[in-house]
Structures are given as structure tokens and as C-alpha cells.
């Protein structure tokens, strides 16, 4: 087991400026190799408390999966359907706006997360109409469209991704989710998503968004065909861009769910990676991102509420969102994907922390009363 106490002491002593001379790839590899999850978790939790104390945030959220039509055919995805498949769907603009308005009325959502497949039949006018329709009807932040979806729109329009981003921002786009990153190493992408945008394209589109004043989250999907070197490389690429653009406001590591996917059918991945890998990834992420990205989500959607509670004790500060209508993870049969505000607040309090409702930019809205 690699002794990582010198790395942890550097971080605890604030012995560097992470935007200029922070932890390195070699440091990240040593942390990834270490089996001392408890010690790394203790340090990660202390770093989280330095930033946010005993508060844990969440957001009232609706997920809108607007289409499952996709021509990328990722081997890790159980959600997509090819064009003209009998189970393929695209939600109309009117229906999508109706769902958002209803969720605002019933649950007082602060954000709608809009994601779907790479549908070649949808031009930018669909998204502009959707965003403007939502903004006209209710005060809800639009957190929408991963870089790979942005790239798909640009290809349909024969336009640049920067122009697509600018038009979507004008239509009401507030921030971008970090989906489509998976592992930012093309060797891995060639195995799990050969038709999806390359790693450098994902990073470029994120940088373009940041330069246009559109903040985003970043993600890592681990526990499939990658190794720890790939994980470290992927995390370092996010760190490198953050030092440059300062546009990532949250990081979300989540484990691959193999059920009903091509990776499982081909025997490449049989099981999910388990709870200890989650806690290690959370702890390493907090340590590596300290001073760079303040917010790390506990990713209850793929790991369950109990593991999300443990993640809060290993460096996460955000429980993610209430979810109504999520269909991507649901397609794997992993678990129930509805979680209410009361359930989240209860889960946070059970580990002795204070629940705080936030907006899509991680600004605190209110401390939840006892």
C-alpha cells in the first residue's frame, strides 16, 4: 500500500496554490493506488468542512429526457433507441414545457436538467423553442445539453459548436451538465463509445462554454473497462482546464451500472464497481480538486441513499437533486430513481449535517428548518 501521508499533509497545510502549482499526475496515481480509504476519507471530509462547514446542499430538480433517439450507440447505455425503433420517442416542445410548469407548481423546482440522445432529426430551433418556452412560463434555471449533444446540434446545423452555444445561451441556457466525459482518454472511448466525440472535443466545447460565461459541471464515469491510470489522466485533464477557464462549478464521479448494456452482454463488465471504489473516488477527487472545484456530488442516483450518506463523510458536499422523471439510469434497472425533498433532508440530517437548498449555481437559498 502506497504511503500517501506526505500528499495529505501538503494539502492539509495549504502548502501550495492549486491554480498554479497543485497536485500532479504522480500524486493522483499514488492516491488512486492507495488502499487507505479511511485516512483519505478523513482528510477529504476535513477539506470539505473547511469550505462549507457542516452544510450539505441539494437542489429541487426535474430531469427531462427529451428524446431517446440516438445514433451514437454507446456500449454503456441502456437508454437509447435507434431512429424509427418502436420504442423511440421525442417529447414535443409543448409537452416538455407542460412538464416543467407542472413540476414548478407541484415541487417548486429550481432547475430542469435537460438531456437526451444524439437525435439527428432535431435542429437548433427545437432547443431554442424549448428553452424560450420554459423561460416564458416559469422561473426555472435550465441546466442542459452535454458537450456531445452540443456537437450533435452543430453537425445537424453545419455550424460551429461555439455558435450553437451562443444561440442556446441567448435562448435561456444557464449552465451545462458534464455528461459525455465518461473517461477522457480516447483509448477507453474507442472501447465503450467509438462514435462519440473525442476527449479533446469534450474539453474544447467546455472551454468554449466557459469563455461565453456558461458554467458547467464535470463528470467521470468509472468502473467499466478503464484502469486507474485512465482515471488519473481524466481527472488531470479536468484540472488542467479548470486552472485555465475556472468554469467548472462541480465534479460528479459516478460508477457505471452494467445492467441491460452492451458491455454486460459482451462480457466486458459483469458487475458494478462497489462502494469502496465510490468512497475512494470521492476522497481522491476532493483532495485533488481542493482549491479548484469546491463542489462534489454524492451521486445517490447510481449508488443509493445509504452510500450517498457515506460519501458525505468522505468529502462530498452536495446531495444532488430531487429527481422526477429520470429515465437513463432507470433503464438499467439499477434502483428507484425518485427522491423527494423530504427524503433528501432526512438523509442529510441522519449523518449529523445541515441540509441547505441551493440553486443551479450552488448559491444557498435556504437552510431547511428542523
Residue map of PLM features:
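Conserved Radical SAM active-site core
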Residues: 81-219, 223-240
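Auxiliary Fe-S-binding modules of radical SAM enzymes
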Residues: 1-38, 104, 235-370
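Conserved short loop/turn motifs at secondary-structure junctions
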Residues: 28-31, 62-64, 116-120, 222-225, ...
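N-terminal pre-triad scaffold of radical SAM enzymes
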Residues: 39-83, 88-115
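Mobile, glycine- and charge-enriched loop segments
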Residues: 48, 56, 60, 77-80, ...
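Hydrophobic faces of well-ordered beta-strands that scaffold small-molecule active sites
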Residues: 56-62, 110-112, 142-146, 176-178, ...
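Conserved, mostly hydrophobic/aromatic
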Residues: 14, 44, 74, 114, ...
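Glycine-rich, proline-tolerant flexible connector loops at the mouths of alpha/beta enzymes
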Residues: 32, 62, 84-85, 113-124, ...
Amino acid at each position: 500500500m502506497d504511503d500517501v501521508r506526505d500528499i495529505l499533509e501538503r494539502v492539509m497545510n495549504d502548502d501550495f496554490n492549486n491554480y498554479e502549482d497543485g497536485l500532479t499526475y504522480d500524486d493522483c496515481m499514488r492516491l488512486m493506488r492507495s488502499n487507505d480509504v479511511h485516512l483519505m476519507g478523513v482528510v477529504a471530509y476535513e477539506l470539505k468542512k473547511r469550505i462549507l462547514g457542516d452544510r450539505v446542499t441539494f437542489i429541487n430538480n426535474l430531469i427531462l429526457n427529451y428524446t431517446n433517439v440516438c445514433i451514437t450507440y454507446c456500449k454503456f447505455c441502456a437508454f437509447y433507441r435507434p431512429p424509427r425503433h418502436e420504442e423511440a420517442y421525442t417529447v414535443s416542445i409543448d409537452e416538455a414545457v407542460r412538464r416543467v410548469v407542472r413540476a414548478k407548481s407541484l415541487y417548486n423546482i429550481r432547475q430542469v436538467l435537460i438531456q437526451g440522445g444524439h437525435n439527428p432529426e432535431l435542429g437548433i430551433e427545437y432547443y431554442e423553442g424549448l428553452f424560450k418556452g420554459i423561460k416564458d412560463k416559469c422561473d426555472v434555471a435550465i441546466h442542459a445539453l452535454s458537450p456531445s449533444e452540443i456537437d450533435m446540434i452543430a453537425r445537424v446545423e453545419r455550424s460551429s459548436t461555439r455558435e450553437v452555444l451562443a444561440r442556446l445561451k441567448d435562448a435561456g441556457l444557464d449552465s451545462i451538465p458534464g455528461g459525455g466525459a465518461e473517461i477522457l482518454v480516447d483509448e477507453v472511448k474507442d472501447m465503450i463509445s467509438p462514435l462519440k466525440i473525442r476527449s479533446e472535443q469534450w474539453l474544447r466545447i467546455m472551454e468554449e462554454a466557459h469563455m461565453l460565461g456558461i458554467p458547467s459541471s464535470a463528470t467521470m464515469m468509472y468502473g467499466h473497462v478503464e484502469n486507474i491510470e485512465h482515471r488519473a489522466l481524466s481527472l488531470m485533464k479536468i484540472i488542467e482546464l479548470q486552472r485555465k477557464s475556472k468554469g467548472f462549478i462541480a465534479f460528479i464521479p459516478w460508477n457505471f451500472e452494467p445492467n441491460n448494456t452492451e458491455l454486460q452482454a459482451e462480457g466486458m463488465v459483469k458487475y458494478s464497481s462497489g462502494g469502496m471504489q465510490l468512497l475512494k473516488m470521492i476522497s481522491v477527487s476532493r483532495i485533488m480538486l481542493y482549491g479548484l472545484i469546491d463542489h462534489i456530488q454524492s451521486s445517490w442516483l447510481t449508488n443509493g441513499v445509504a452510500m450517498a450518506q457515506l460519501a458525505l463523510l468522505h468529502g462530498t458536499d452536495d446531495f444532488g437533486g430531487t429527481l422526477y422523471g429520470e429515465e437513463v439510469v432507470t433503464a438499467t434497472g439499477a434502483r428507484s430513481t425518485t427522491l423527494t425533498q423530504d427524503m433528501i433532508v432526512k438523509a442529510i440530517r441522519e449523518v449529523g449535517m445541515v441540509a441547505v437548498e441551493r440553486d443551479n449555481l450552488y448559491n444557498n437559498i435556504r437552510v431547511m428548518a428542523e
